[in-house]
């Protein structure tokens, strides 16, 4: 049995799920850290946003690779 078509989209879906889990963990840790030490918000917020950007970049790269490989 041979599979054709949208297997690359399954890979993108897995990349998006991984990215979503990563973003959830990043902001859960950020909220937990700010709840424990509110004065550390100015230090933790840029780190959380950088982590968010890197996690979302992986999802965007997964989407790009899904379309490039599929073409």
Swiss-Prot record:
Subunit structure: F-type ATPases have 2 components, F(1) - the catalytic core - and F(0) - the membrane proton channel. F(1) has five subunits: alpha(3), beta(3), gamma(1), delta(1), epsilon(1). F(0) has three main subunits: a(1), b(2) and c(10-14). The alpha and beta chains form an alternating ring which encloses part of the gamma chain. F(1) is attached to F(0) by a central stalk formed by the gamma and epsilon chains, while a peripheral stalk is formed by the delta and b chains.
One Pfam family, short name: ATP-synt_C
SUPFAM superfamilies: F1F0 ATP synthase subunit C
Record's function text: F(1)F(0) ATP synthase produces ATP from ADP in the presence of a proton or sodium gradient. F-type ATPases consist of two structural domains, F(1) containing the extramembraneous catalytic core and F(0) containing the membrane proton channel, linked together by a central stalk and a peripheral stalk. During catalysis, ATP synthesis in the catalytic domain of F(1) is coupled via a rotary mechanism of the central stalk subunits to proton translocation.
Site keyed Reversibly protonated during proton transport: positions: 56
Protein name according to UniProt: ATP synthase subunit c
Top-level lineage group: Bacteria
UniProt membrane topology term: Multi-pass membrane protein
GO MF entries: lipid binding; proton-transporting ATP synthase activity, rotational mechanism
Keyword Nucleus: no
Protein family (similarity comment): Belongs to the ATPase C chain family.
């Amino acid at each position: 049995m041979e599979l054709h078509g949208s297997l690359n989209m399954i890979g993108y879906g897995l990349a998006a799920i991984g990215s979503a889990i990563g973003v959830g963990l990043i902001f859960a840790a950020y909220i937990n850290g700010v709840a424990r030490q509110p004065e550390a918000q100015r230090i933790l917020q840029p780190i959380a946003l950088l982590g968010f950007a890197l996690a979302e970049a992986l999802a965007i790269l997964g989407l790009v690779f899904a379309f490039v490989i599929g073409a």
